[in-house]
Amino acid sequence: MQRIGIFLIALLAGWPLLSAQQMINAPLLGLQVDVVYLSSDLLEGRETGKEGETMAAQYIAHRFQELGLQPKGAGGSWYQSFDFNYKAHPHAEEGEARTGKNVLGYLDNGAEQTVIIGAHYDHLGHGIMGSLNAGDPAIHNGADDNASGVAAMLRIAEDLKKGRDKNNNYLFMGFSGEEMGLYGSKYFANNPTINLGKANYMLNLDMVGRLNEEKVLAISGAGTSPAWKEVMEGLSIGGIQAKLSDSGIGPSDHTSFYLKDIPVLHFFTGQHTDYHKPSDDAELVNYQGILLVTDYILALIDELDDNGPLAFTKTKDEEEGKRAAAFKVTLGVMPDYVYTGEGMRIDGVIDGRPGAAAGLENGDIIIRIGDMEVKDIYDYMEGLGKYKVGDKAIVVVKRGEEVIDKEVEF
């Protein structure tokens, strides 16, 4: 399907498109066209192994071809298929055999090293496991999660194809199966179509469509190479405030590459109340924000172009993993990952969970759980690790200028 056709579909559907002045900005319009199509009801939530996933994969392959990339999937195709056993819930005795597919496009500059730039394109269909929807099954369009990341990846590919930064080759990947457990990226990492020993670094774009007014961009993996902080500390792009964290392990596809000793970064504009709900729609995406994020990433690639192979550094994931895995209870709140102050700010409260029952609200900043002072998200997780189901605790929060005690029963 030609992109102009997709644009007309959006127009006829009455979708709020960019203003005439914004349309002059071709990259901005391109981002919107990609997000609008990938997050349309036509694709029914892009569930891995379903028809909507296939349609999304075909669109990405078409875009790669349009940009002049080379196919880098199995047998010279755009695709790399992987089989998996789908279970509707973890305790199901039997599963359903399914096949998902990664989409791969390659920019060959004749270089020794290859940079991998990826974004998952699958989502939750009509509300598979992981959905936070409390109502009837409904299409989860996943505009921010992760049509935004795919659109950003395509914009980066378009810029790099113009001839900049030619000291690396570039492999662009649309991963599937991320929502079910990083299936696609794990499969590629174990069955690569390039020599991973020559992979310079990996950049993962997952949920980059909700840049806030402060322009805070969360970047994890900054400890996986000494080069990252050296370069990023000197970057000043469009007012972006980079919030760096070291760990190479997280709930997204960069983890699969970190575990192969490849330096990684994960770019993320933050959680929101539409996360994993049917309301994550294209009209809520900050397209100018995506453009700023891609400008930042392109500037980072520019700075690294003459650096040669990046050194890899293991991060302290074992300790963080133990703390994260230790808790058996949850408050049922979504952390604000781009919050830079002390404490753990709540970005969403899930109905029917202990936090909601105790009266916690969006914007509350948790500063203590029981006797555990909370200065960051890791203190928060460590505090939760002290409790089991049925226990009670006093959770202390800042709400504006007020400090409030809330009793929570887990």
Task: Locate the predicted segments by residue.
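A non-catalytic alpha/beta surface segment that caps or lines the substrate-entry region
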Residues: 46-107
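Conserved PDZ fold ligand-binding element
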Residues: 357-377
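PDZ-domain C-terminal substructure recognizer with occasional recognition of PDZ-binding tails
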Residues: 382-410
